[in-house]
Curated annotation (Swiss-Prot):
It comes from the Bacteria. Keywords: Cell outer membrane, Lipoprotein, Membrane, Palmitate, Plasmid, Protein transport, Signal, Transmembrane, Transmembrane helix, Transport, Virulence. A lipid is attached at C19 (N-palmitoyl cysteine). The keyword Membrane applies. One of its GO terms (biological process) is protein secretion. Residues 1-18 form the signal peptide. It comes from Yersinia pseudotuberculosis serotype I (strain IP32953). The chain crosses the membrane at residues 218-238. A lipid is attached at C19 (S-diacylglycerol cysteine). InterPro entries: AMP-bd_C_sf (IPR045851), FliF_N_dom (IPR006182), T3SS_SctJ (IPR003282), YscJ/FliF (IPR043427). It is a lipid-anchor. The gene is yscJ. This is Yop proteins translocation lipoprotein J.
Length: 244
């Protein structure tokens, strides 16, 4: 009886220590798969499960939550959710002035451009800010011309300087009345460098982080402990019987 109780307790402990918790919920299939692949490449034990509305959720070992969030954050995950034209111009929205309508339209365009730029390989964060021209005042003086600023944070191991003309052209063609020379692009490389393939990988066994080379040794040690547990219980049982 004691042996069975001890084994049941051990199995329960091992089961609880190996449980996974939600890391992110309500993410798209595409982004979820990218995040899952990234976590596994970094040596973390991660899984995905179906979520509401066709979305998925990511699960990791509870002890890996902080590390997983840090890894994904440094790689720009999860991506920002950008507004669409439908969000900016709801069907039941109130009537706005022409200036307000133009401002909302350009904001929606800036959001769409940011979304497009974020799809480029290596882009971690993309922002587009548009400044609208002022109306002509009563004295007949012209206001400041429209301008746009593009901010891109990218992976440090990718050169983005050659993309600047294409980025400016994309913004120029998307915003009406915006001159090419009134567009500025700021590129900021991330301090994080992509992990090289020759670096050692870690894996998680029962919430214990070990290298791939040490995984077999840990499994062997745990197996030995499981085998020794009933042996020690039997030895204790026979010793108590002899004392009686």
């Amino acid at each position: 009886m004691k042996v069975k109780t001890s084994l049941s307790t051990l199995i329960l402990i091992l089961f609880l220590t190996g449980c996974k918790v939600d890391l992110y919920t309500g993410i798209s299939q595409k982004e979820g798969n990218e995040m899952l692949a990234l976590l596994r490449q970094e040596g973390l034990s991660a899984d995905k499960e179906p979520d509401k509305d066709g979305k998925i959720k990511l699960l990791v070992e509870e002890s890996d939550v902080a590390q997983a969030i840090d890894i994904l954050k440094r790689k720009g995950y999860p991506h920002e959710s950008f507004s669409t034209l439908q969000d900016v111009f709801p069907k039941d929205g109130l009537i706005s002035s022409p200036i307000e309508e133009l401002a909302r339209l350009n904001y929606a365009k800036a959001q769409e451009i940011s979304r497009t730029l974020s799809e480029i390989d290596g882009v971690l964060v993309a922002r587009v800010h548009v400044v609208l021209p002022e109306e002509q005042n009563n004295k007949g003086k012209k206001g400041v011309a429209a301008s746009a600023s593009v901010f891109i944070k990218h992976a440090a191991d990718i050169q983005f300087d050659t993309y600047i003309p294409q980025i400016k052209q994309l913004v120029n063609n998307s915003i009406e009345g915006l001159a090419y020379d009134r567009i500025s692009v700021i590129l900021v490389p991330s301090v994080d460098v992509r992990q090289s393939s020759h670096l050692p990988r870690n894996t998680s066994i029962l919430s214990i982080q070990v290298s791939e080379e040490s995984k077999g040794h840990l499994i062997g040690l745990l197996s030995l402990l499981i085998l020794l547990l009933p042996v020690t219980n039997l030895a204790q049982y026979f010793w108590l019987q002899r004392k009686k």
